[in-house]
Amino acid sequence: MFSSGAGDLFQLLRDGRPRTRSELVDETGLARTSVVNRLAALTAIGLVTPTGTAAASGGRPAARLMFDQASRVCIGIDLGATHGTVGVLNLSGDVLCQESRVIDIADGPTEILTWAVNTAERLLAASGRQQRDLLGIGVGVPGPVEHSTGRPIRPPIMPGWDGFDIPAFVRRRLIATVLVDNDVNLLALGERATQWPAVDDLLFIKVSTGIGAGIILGGVLQRGSRGSAGDIGHVQVPGTANDRDLEATASAPAIAAYLSRDGAVNIEPGDVTDRIRMGDLTAIAAAREAGRAIGEVTAMCVSVLNPSVVVIGGQLGVNVQEIIAGIREVVYRRSIPLANQHLNIVPARGGSDAGIRGAGLMVLDERLCAAAVDELIEQLD
């Protein structure tokens, strides 16, 4: 027997397929009166809407109802170390509009979040929406986060952010639920939803100013007890000088520092990709070696977690094939054979909006779950 709540009935409709009341009766096993009452409640809170009629063999055609994906919106905010994106999404997680700019996360939470909130308000207005249409706001930041509070926990590349109450700051102007997570976790959610929806076990590795991983196992994002699951950037890499950690060995700043070591040129982290594209043999070799270092840590993750897919994203992960080549070389050699037998290691394909998509999905998963929908109905009463 199907669960009795309206929120449970709504979960069936989230696939976007229109259904008649009779079809829902057959699908759920509920009495017709129960289905009618639950649909009325879902319609009252704006989540379900009529959409035409179904063909009938005789008598009056039956009305069809479906999930109203345009009834509300959510906001996704993706903050990296050097780049920020804000977007408005519908209830299916489709991006309606977005805006990006170069940022420096070290400028601190007040400056960065003020820009993000200003941009969100402007995009909300541009999409013809008001705050009452806002279901929630998802925020990604480049460091460990205590998900239950939305506060960063000793983030290594985010000076001034430790313990900062991000939800409270955002809610000063945007009155809605605010959820915060590590940016790589949200990239993992966005990449899986758009590129690998049938894959339940996925590891997303971001290689950029920092290095981190998002872990999805059994279709569920894994955050760990304190939000540090996937914080591989500070894992020591065997065989490096003084057993340096992964970020100090293979991140964009680490490669730039290596290329600038003799003082003849000063390479910035953002220039690394260009040097490789120009055919700089030293830069190419450094990128390949960085990929091997990342591969050492990834091989351990693959052996322990046994994902079906490893996605390599971030500024270097997507744009520098030598990084992925180095990762593949080591992972297939060093991880246990059973774990890598059918393993795919691929560049990210979700595009520049994967982070805000993931932020939106985080909001939708929490605010449109069965219990949350039932709560919305109770509030209406």
PLM segments and residue spans:
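Glycine-rich phosphate-binding loop of actin/hexokinase-like ATP-binding domains
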Residues: 198-250
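Short, acidic, Ser/Thr-enriched surface-loop or helix-capping motifs
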Residues: 90, 147, 216
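Hydrophobic "anchor" residues
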Residues: 95, 152, 221-222
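Short, active-site-adjacent cap segments at secondary-structure transitions
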Residues: 144-147, 185-188, 212, 222, ...
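Glycine-rich phosphate-binding loop and adjoining helix at the ATP-binding site
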Residues: 100-201, 322-333
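Short helix-capping/turn signature of helix-turn-helix
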Residues: 15-16, 194, 208
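Short glycine-aspartate micro-motif
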Residues: 74-78, 134-138, 202-206, 212-214
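ATP-binding/phosphotransfer module of carbohydrate and carboxylate kinases, centering on a glycine-rich
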Residues: 1-53, 57-132, 174, 239-381
